[in-house]
């Protein structure tokens, strides 16, 4: 970059960005800072491990402890709804700031609730709500950040911001996880942390993220977004009708299934309990079917294309691995001999630490292979994490969280395949579609928790394993089966290098 280029608006925007270089630089720095705040608060914003350990501490069963993570991923359809409700470019900064502010408010409410002398049921409900709110606003914030940086900077100048955001960012997540370990207590590579007493430790953990999100909300106001000649108008309701119908049906399905699974001793005290439990299970199944049909209707234009349909099925199957960390954390008591909350920090640290290394290696790997290889590599690591969790006990069990963190990069390489299989004029629509593929995979988290509770309540024991250990290992097996099916389908059916001009014409 020459000095004259850095001071010339005309030269600063060779691809059409109307902003001057100082304005673009400001946007790039703010992008990196806002992304960094999300990583620093990752122990509470990446819903799963921390929330599951807290629910467990409050006496919740495995089904309930999995609900925060399930709801988090179920709400990842919200970016599409927010984009529909407020499509104007002029509202980008406001919407981004509101997302961060909403997260800060929810974290404040949760911290206060944990400090109040209220029942554990209310506290668990607030934890689940925090999972849902985080699932709604944080993916929306990420989508808005990308749109702001897309409109507010030249493509050739984004490299430094991206390296700062996604190179240093995960290191901030490691730092946040270290602080989590110091607060909750536990052992970290030979160092012992006594931690603070409960509930003070969790109150401080959630409260500490409030000012971090507050800063992100404040920084969002300083983005520079060039005005457009004509603002986009809101599309008709029919454009998002499938989502609007599918989301509440999915929530109703999980709620009905959860209510139908109350302990037998509690259910027997209710009149007509057997009938009501059966009825709730039937209604839950109908709601699940209705949700599936609604989502298929919403995505019908994409799912008519053979390669995109197959890639979607592969992605959903593999994404079922994203909702297993709650069970992996809860299993800590069985395999490590201490309560799950004592391992939440080190588990998150390994998760993000492995991700830093894997991100670098896999990026190099992709440049020398093909889009399908990226899916297969990350999916295989995902599968290895479950096999490790099934077979390994003692301190080495924790490596499963590192492998899982590296495997989570399938969330980068599966979308990359779908982008590679898409026509240029369909990219924006298909990228919006990709962000919502966690929605149909989200109920798998509740399934994993249900497996644990069912086996435990049934008292099954095999090969010297108690029912709790057996239940967790079976849930890991179920997760591994989903991932393995995705891998096999990718190998057999997906072309290594999809051809948008040819493959997308193979309509089914």
Where are these regions (language model features)?
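Structural signature of the two symmetry-related core transmembrane helices
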Residues: 94-110, 373-388
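Multi-pass alpha-helical transporter architecture, strongest
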Residues: 111-115, 211-224, 388-389, 475-508
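A membrane-interface helix-boundary motif in multi-pass transporters
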Residues: 92-94, 182-211, 266-278, 452-483
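Helix-loop boundary and gating motifs at the non-cytosolic
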Residues: 9-78, 83-86, 256-266, 307-348
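C-terminal transmembrane helical hairpin of 12-TM major facilitator-type secondary transporters
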Residues: 373-411
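Helix-loop junctions at membrane interfaces in 12-TM secondary transporters
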Residues: 112-130, 388-400
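Substrate-agnostic recognition of the 12-TM MFS/MFS-like secondary transporter fold
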Residues: 30-44, 48, 68-83, 99-103, ...
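Juxtamembrane intracellular "pre-TM" segments in multi-pass secondary transporters
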Residues: 10-25, 226-313, 507-508
């Amino acid at each position: 970059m020459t000095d004259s280029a850095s001071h010339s608006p005309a030269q600063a925007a060779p691809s059409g960005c109307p902003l001057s270089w100082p304005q673009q630089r400001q946007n790039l720095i703010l992008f990196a800072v806002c992304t960094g705040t999300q990583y620093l608060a990752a122990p509470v914003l990446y819903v799963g491990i921390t929330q599951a350990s807290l629910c467990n501490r409050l006496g919740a069963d495995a089904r309930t402890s999995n609900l925060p993570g399930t709801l988090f991923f179920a709400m990842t359809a919200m970016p599409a709804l927010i984009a529909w409700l407020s499509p104007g470019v002029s509202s980008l900064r406001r919407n981004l700031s509101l997302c961060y502010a909403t997260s800060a408010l929810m974290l404040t409410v949760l911290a206060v609730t944990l400090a109040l002398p209220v029942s554990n049921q209310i506290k668990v409900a607030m934890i689940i709500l925090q999972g849902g709110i985080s699932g709604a606003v944080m993916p929306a914030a990420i989508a808005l950040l990308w749109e702001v940086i897309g409109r507010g900077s030249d493509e050739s100048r984004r490299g430094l911001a991206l390296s700062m955001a996604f190179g240093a960012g995960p290191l901030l997540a490691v730092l946040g996880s270290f602080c989590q370990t110091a607060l909750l207590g536990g052992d970290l590579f030979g160092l012992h942390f006594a931690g603070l007493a409960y509930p003070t430790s969790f109150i401080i953990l959630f409260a500490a993220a409030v000012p971090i999100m507050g800063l992100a909300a404040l920084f969002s106001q300083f983005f520079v977004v060039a005005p457009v000649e004509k603002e986009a108008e809101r599309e008709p309701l029919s454009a998002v009708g499938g989502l609007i119908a599918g989301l509440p049906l999915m929530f109703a399905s999980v709620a009905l299934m959860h209510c139908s699974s109350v302990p037998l001793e509690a259910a027997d005290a209710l009149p007509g309990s057997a009938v009501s439990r059966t009825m709730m299970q039937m209604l839950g199944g109908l709601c699940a079917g209705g949700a599936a049909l609604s989502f298929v209707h919403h995505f019908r234009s994409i799912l008519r294309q053979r390669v995109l349909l197959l890639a979607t099925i592969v992605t959903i199957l593999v994404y079922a691995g994203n909702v297993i960390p709650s069970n992996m954390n809860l299993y800590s008591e069985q395999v490590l001999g201490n309560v799950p909350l004592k391992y939440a920090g080190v588990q998150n640290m390994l998760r993000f630490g492995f991700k830093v290394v894997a991100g670098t290696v896999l990026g190099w790997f992709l440049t020398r292979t093909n889009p399908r290889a990226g899916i297969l590599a990350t999916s295989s690591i995902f599968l290895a994490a479950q096999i490790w969790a099934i077979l390994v006990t003692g301190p080495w069990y924790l490596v499963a969280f590192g492998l899982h963190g590296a495997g989570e990069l399938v969330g980068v390489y599966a979308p990359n395949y779908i982008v590679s299989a898409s026509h240029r004029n369909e990219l924006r629509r298909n990228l919006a579609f990709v962000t919502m593929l966690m929605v149909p995979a989200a109920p798998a988290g509740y399934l994993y928790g249900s497996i644990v509770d069912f086996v435990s309540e049934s008292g099954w024991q095999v090969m010297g394993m108690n029912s709790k250990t057996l239940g967790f290992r079976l849930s890991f097996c179920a997760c591994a089966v989903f991932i393995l099916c995705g891998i096999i389908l990718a190998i057999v059916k997906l072309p290594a290098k999809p051809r948008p001009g040819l493959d997308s014409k193979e309509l089914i």
